[in-house]
């Protein structure tokens, strides 16, 4: 995985040039055919999902993103009667990689997830280079077969970084005010370092000298960062934001690189889409990034909302009209049977294993260290299928001595 440096905003040569590079040795017909999704299974419907992931989506939702590649999880969430192919295109801008390089340092949970996200991305690219696309990256023992989701994960190239920032301002549809941000917070946590209130009885000079000597220490840096998260409402930064809530907010400088990439993919790349659901959308867990991206007309969603788009074809960005006739009574709370809120997960699609209950007398004299661990044998846990309940609900009966779990990643559990 390579990190591409940020290009200058004053790069007029790139600005006036074509954003696509073509290989002179490759015919134009082959390039056009390669850009089109291949019809792997003729006769099946196809649906394209295009998402842009920033670092917060990986750091705070790495478990969810891994499930997108787990075939057992996909089988349980996608309607088995829907005969369709899903082309999931995941775009990782260079902004995400640079933020990984900053977040991955340390021993915090965010740093651990950032390193895990980098390893996960590397694993996917390694399997593509080795020609192992047929297997499940989350379950190497799975057998190749007809898949419901076809993946295309790629990293931003230098010619895809987007136009200059002065040109990006032409796409701005709204100038957000400070009061539109959650908790009036318009800056990232790293920009708020050192802005906690000065303790009583301590001068400004001594306080600043204390910060300068301790910020060289990584542990002191993290401690002050955590202190700002806890006492942000008592900080001078919060008081200034509260007093100027009606003023226009100022965008964090480094966020421009993400906005430029999103503008290029959504407005400049000029790809034809069959529906608004297929347009490029930014997946982020950061509320500050979401406000600024929406101000440029870029649809945003979190990781859970992205799962609704992938598995249920439900876009959270679609506007829903308010019906004034509703009185919020019990009758109004009922939803249509095909509503997204009525969908359930068929857990019987997960693999079952038999519950072994060894007797105490049998293993009483055995040494625990010499006991061999055997892999549990998979069984059919469904006893009867096709039953209906009193309300006409579909019911499946399971064996009492069988158990199944949601799919998890393979590997050994780390122990301190």
UniProtKB/Swiss-Prot annotation:
Chief place where the protein resides: cytoplasm
The answer to whether the entry has keyword Cytoplasm is yes
The record's section on InterPro entries has: PIN_dom
Alphabetical GO CC annotations of the entry are: cytoplasm
One of its GO biological process terms is: nuclear-transcribed mRNA catabolic process, nonsense-mediated decay
Keyword Membrane listed? The answer is no
Its localization reads: Cytoplasm
Q: Which UniProt keywords apply?
A: Cytoplasm, Nonsense-mediated mRNA decay
State the signal peptide span.
none
Q: Where is the composition biased (Basic and acidic residues)?
A: 12-21
Q: Please list where the region (Disordered) is annotated.
A: 1-21, 195-218, 356-393
Compositionally skewed regions (Basic residues) per UniProt = 360-375
Q: What's this chain's function?
A: Involved in nonsense-mediated decay of mRNAs containing premature stop codons.
What is this protein identified as? Nonsense-mediated decay protein 4
The gene it comes from is NMD4
């Amino acid at each position: 995985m390579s990190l591409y440096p940020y290009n200058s905003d004053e790069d007029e040569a790139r600005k006036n040039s074509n954003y696509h590079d073509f290989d002179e040795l490759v015919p134009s017909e082959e390039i056009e055919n390669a850009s089109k999704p291949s019809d792997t299974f003729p006769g099946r419907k196809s649906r394209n999902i295009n998402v842009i992931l920033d670092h917060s989506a990986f750091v705070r939702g790495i478990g969810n993103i891994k499930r997108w590649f787990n075939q057992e999880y996909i089988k349980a969430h996608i309607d088995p009667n829907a005969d369709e192919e899903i082309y999931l295109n995941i775009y990782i801008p260079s902004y995400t990689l640079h933020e990984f390089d900053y977040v991955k340092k340390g021993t915090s949970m965010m740093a651990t997830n950032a390193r895990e996200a980098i390893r996960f991305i590397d694993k996917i690219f390694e399997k593509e280079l080795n020609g192992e696309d047929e297997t499940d990256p989350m379950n190497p023992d799975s057998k190749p077969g007809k898949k419901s989701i076809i993946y295309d994960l790629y990293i931003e190239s230098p010619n895809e970084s987007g136009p200059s920032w002065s040109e990006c301002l032409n796409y701005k549809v709204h100038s957000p005010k400070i009061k539109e941000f959650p908790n009036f917070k318009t800056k990232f946590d790293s920009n708020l370092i050192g802005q906690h209130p000065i303790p009583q009885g301590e001068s400004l000079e001594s306080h600043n000298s204390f910060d300068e000597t301790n910020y060289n220490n990584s542990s002191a840096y993290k401690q002050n960062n955590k202190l700002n998260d806890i006492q942000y409402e008592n900080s001078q930064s919060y008081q200034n934001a509260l007093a100027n809530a009606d003023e226009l907010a100022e965008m964090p400088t480094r966020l421009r690189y993400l906005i430029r990439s999103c503008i290029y993919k959504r407005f400049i790349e000029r790809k034809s889409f069959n529906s608004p659901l297929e347009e490029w959308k930014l997946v982020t867990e950061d509320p500050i990034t979401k406000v600024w991206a929406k101000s440029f007309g870029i649809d945003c969603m979190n990781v859970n909302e992205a799962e609704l788009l992938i598995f249920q074809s439900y876009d959270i960005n679609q506007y829903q009209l308010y019906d004034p006739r509703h009185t919020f009574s019990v009758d109004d709370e009922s939803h249509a049977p095909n509503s997204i809120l009525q969908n359930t997960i068929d857990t019987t699609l997960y693999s079952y294993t038999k519950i072994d209950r060894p007797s105490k007398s049998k293993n009483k004299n055995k040494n625990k260290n010499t006991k061999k661990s055997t892999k549990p044998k998979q069984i059919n846990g469904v006893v009867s299928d096709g039953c209906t309940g009193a309300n006409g609900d579909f019911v499946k009966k399971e064996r009492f001595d069988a158990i199944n779990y949601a799919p998890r990643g393979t590997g050994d559990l780390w122990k301190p």
